[in-house]
Amino acid sequence: MMDNDDALLNNGGPQSGAETVYGTEDNNMVMSEKNDQVVSIVQQLAGSIYQEFERMINRYDEDVVKNLMPLLVNVLECLDASYRINQEQDVELELLREDNEQLVTQYEREKSARKQSEQKLLEAEDLAEQENKELATRLESVESIVRMLELKHKNSLEHASRLEERETDLKKEYNKLHERYTELFKNHVDYMERTKMLMGSTHSQMSTASDRMEVSRARLNPVARSSGPVSYGFASLENSVMLDTETICSVGSQSDDSGPPSLQNELDMSLPSTAERGAATDSLQQQHQATSPQSPPDTSPVVPNVPPANVGRSTTKKEQRSDNNLYQELSFQDNEESEENEIVTGCWVHPGEYASSANDNYFGMGKEVENLIMENNELLATKNALNIVKDDLIVKVDELTGEVEIVREELSAMQQSRTKLRQRISELEEELKKTKEQVKQQNTEQEENDVPLAQRKRFTRVEMAMVLMERNQYKERLMELQEAVRLTEILRASRTVDNLDKKSKQSIWKYFSNLFTPSNRPTERIADGLGGGPMFRNTGGGSPAHSHGSPSRGSGDNRLTLAGSQPPMHPASAGLANALVMPKDYSEDGGSERISARRREQYRQLRAHVQKEDGRLHAYGWSLPINKANQEANPSRHSGGVPVPVYCNPLAEASPHMKVFCAAGVNLHGGFTKDGQSLIPADSPYAPKSTLKITEITSPTAEQSVEALDRQIARASLETLEPETQLSSFVWICTSTHAASTVSVVDANQSATVLDAFPICSSHLLCIASVQGAMESDYALLEQSEVVKAGEMLQRPGEGTELLGKVEFVRVKPKSEDEQNSNSKPQQQQQDEEEAKEATEKSNEPLPPVNAEEPLVNVEAIKIRQALPGAPQRLSSGNSGSDGNQANNNNSSSTGSVLFATKSLNPILGTKEREDPPMTSVGPTMWMGAQDGWLYVHSGVGRWHECLHRVLLPDAVLAIVHVEARVVVALANAQLAVFRRQTDGQWDLNSYHLVTLGDRNHSIRCLCVAGERIWAAHRNKIFIVDPISLNIVHSLDAHPRKESQVRQMAATGAGVWVSIRLDSTLRLYNTHTFEHKQDVDIEPYVSKMLGTGKLGFSFVRITALMVSCNRLWIGTSNGVIISVPLAEVQQKTSSDPHGQMPLCCMANAQLSFHGHRDAVKFFVSVPMLQQPNLNGGLTFVNKRPDMLVMCGGEGYIDFRINDNDMENSIQLEPNQTIENRGDKSYLIVWHVSQR
């Protein structure tokens, strides 16, 4: 030992750089360090530790630090490494800071560059805008030019048409002149013939006359031809006229030279020539139209037998129109004729001169004709001049019209520009006014800062009117809120308790917890306070045994249960007549001693009022009228008239802040595929048997008479079943906290056992509905629907400003995460489940140890199972590894599910959870609507936690109903969403129809199915809608005020009961005639039964409504439950072909002493468990099955017992107080026998 000490002292410390040996032969460790590699701080620390160890070795021994030194060395090494890492990180941090500075500099540079680019962009936009304006201006000018050209084109067309009309008029005038000239020529010829016959005196005179006749004959042919319509105005005939004249003259001269002239020859030649001239004159128009071919140039010049006139006529085929007027043509013709006659005969004599030389008496008419022709020519010339002037004027008018149009367009453009400039000026003036007002306001504010408030400027009239109007609106809202707050405060005051400190009270309850045993409880006092009600006893929570007598002790969880005077029950419900628990539900802090004393006095008055007989009898927790009590005096003989309470307990003991919102029974009917196969196995007790198949019931196949009769009986029994009797005994209850919403599945026959519980979403679930599986009739209805006939795109415009009746088709675009919904849950649902897990971890109660790999959501399930009576605890610390692996497999197969440890078999399919086949929406489904607009569809058969479909709707979902193979969803924006099945039987949530029923600012509060129609409540109106055609069949006003909204509706038979918000009156309407049948006010009844005044029972508001078991079930806002039997006389004597009218009378009403401390949330009616037949299926007999009516609400209260008695009758859990029991949601179940 001394040698080791000397060696240690000689070696010095770790700063010497030498090696130091510690320990014995079995445990030695060498530590060598280099000063340049070790951090200085670690070196100093190691030196100080070395000195301490040296003192310890000197004082004690080497063995003291033998085992500690290696550990310390490791610590120092780790510290050194951490220091080095820290230094490296400091260096990296400096580098990162430099990089950050560079990035900031670059960011600033990029920011400035972006500003410059934005500035350039703005400049480019300005340039583009200016170019657009210039182009627009050019476009306007081009358009004006185009319009001007179009106008000119139009004017030119009009001018051309006028020219054509002028040409037509000239042709008509020419024809008239030609006829006139022909008549004059005929008169002249006749005159000449008479003259020649009178002349016979001398031969010289006759020769002279014959010469003149020849000359006149030579002139007649060209004159007749030139004066006719064929040669007039055509330049091509001028040469032909000259040639014909020469030919005729030559022929005539030859004939004259061939023989001696005589009077007889001249007369013989003149007569046929005259006749030919007349015929030629009459047939000029016909010869003009003829198309005889011309003779070739090398033929014989003239045929002697052909008259000379025909030769001239044959040359008028290709004549062209000349541009000469009538005067020019006539003058040209006269000149031509004179030249021809001079050439042929050598001299030309005017007819006037001939007439004067021969005989002035006979030839005076020709001069008059010539005068007339001259006058006519002058008139024609004047007319032509006037026409020319007129044409010039028309052209000038057209030019002026075009200029006027151009000026008009320019004027309109100037007016538009002036209007734009005025608008711009007005805008600038408004901006200037606003700027001036702002400047004035700023100046005024600056001035008013130094002015007291009393001396400042007052409001104007407009501002005062606006302020008053806003004040009135706010005042109306304030009054409504004050009324709601007053009712809430009254109800809250009715639930206040004595002034007790929470901490002291909790400690006292813990300290004296052993004193509250069943033997020390004042059960006798409770039994005495029940009046004519049933006795109570203490039994085990899971024991189905009954004891009829004094209270006895149970072996399990102690609960207050019905005993003694309980009626005989159905054998299947033997396990239900146990454990009617009536715990107290207090959650508010106590007030002063004066308030607690007043509270006790109020409950004493209420208890005294309730215990009054007043002609009523108390039985089974109900207050019965005297006439009903006489009928129910012998319970054994007639026990089916009064509902018997069989269960009352919180839904989830471990979740005090979880509130129930809604619930629905599961309808397991249907589930047939298109080929007729059922999704539910045949060995399941809920499987549809052959006697109940619709296809076999309605099939027209040949059967034996007995089998056919059995099927008809089965069909009739199936049709006469009430809707609630077709449900199963499973109930889905939706509960919500501030963070998540959860669904709990319970069996009403064993309400204390929660089969499954799983989260749905983070929002509140507002409604739930059960939808039966696909029936074979649904496929035929789907194929024959109007929506399919319209190509799935049925749309219809709305009416009015609210678009009432508008139908629009919505198709949801598929998303990638929705496509993977069948394999894994969506991200939103996983987030919702995580929030639900966080919400379930808030309880501080002890839990049994569970597997570390199991999800935290199961902790909530275990908490609930611990609190439920009679629930076996199968998950404990003693689970084997195989069980843990099995639980892990279950959780992995169903991601995010919440499964109870007690759930081993599916009660419907009879299989284990992990062995359940994949579910589809062809089978029975449960539809849930959330406040955020999501609609969730889960299977009602198996794998309850898995979401089959979901869709986001435009607004919150408030109600869901199923009718005629359609699911109709009411939204908060006054729309109905209608879903239908696909051709394979699954529900199609990717496409649906929206039907608008009113203003989008108000919601559709509730839906109801009456027959084959849907009753939808929107504000104070009720719309009856056909779910197939989506037409609004009828609408009615349930209340005269629009502000009074319809809140609940319940249909049965031929009537629909309707309740109004903030109203205690129920209204009954006929489903077929839509007539108002009856009004029932429940407020006087509640006030009579429970008293009025300070407890707030006079303010009755209906919050839940249901018709079941031939009863009208009513739940109020203060927790009172009323059951009103329907009129039996109406049921027996009704002759309505459409159904029975559900009339009722409040004189027969029954009030339950078991109620809730807050509003009643829901009623659910499901049948009790049916006895299976030999084949394993359910049998339906003629008698109606017994029903279980479940009611849910917040807290529990018995109106017959005061607070102190109820506190003494409560058994608390180990770490539980009365305060946290007041926040729980309670379920109350009644058994109603219909036999």
From Swiss-Prot:
Which residue windows does the record flag with biased composition (Pro residues)?
294-307
Q: Which residues form a coiled coil?
A: 84-184, 366-493
Enumerate the spans annotated as RH1 domain: 25-113
Task: Output compositional bias ranges, type Low complexity.
Answer: 544-555, 821-830
- Compositional bias, Gly residues, is annotated for 529-543
Q: Which domain of life is it from?
A: Eukaryota
A GO molecular function assigned to this protein is: kinesin binding
Q: Which Pfam families is this protein grouped with?
A: JIP_LZII, RH1, WD40_2
Q: What does this protein do?
A: The JNK-interacting protein (JIP) group of scaffold proteins selectively mediates JNK-signaling by aggregating specific components of the MAPK cascade to form a functional JNK signaling module. May function as a regulator of vesicle transport, through interactions with the JNK-signaling components and motor proteins. Syd is required for efficient kinesin-I mediated axonal transport.
Annotated family: Belongs to the JIP scaffold family.
What is the protein's given name? JNK-interacting protein 3
- Which lineage? Eukaryota, Metazoa, Ecdysozoa, Arthropoda, Hexapoda
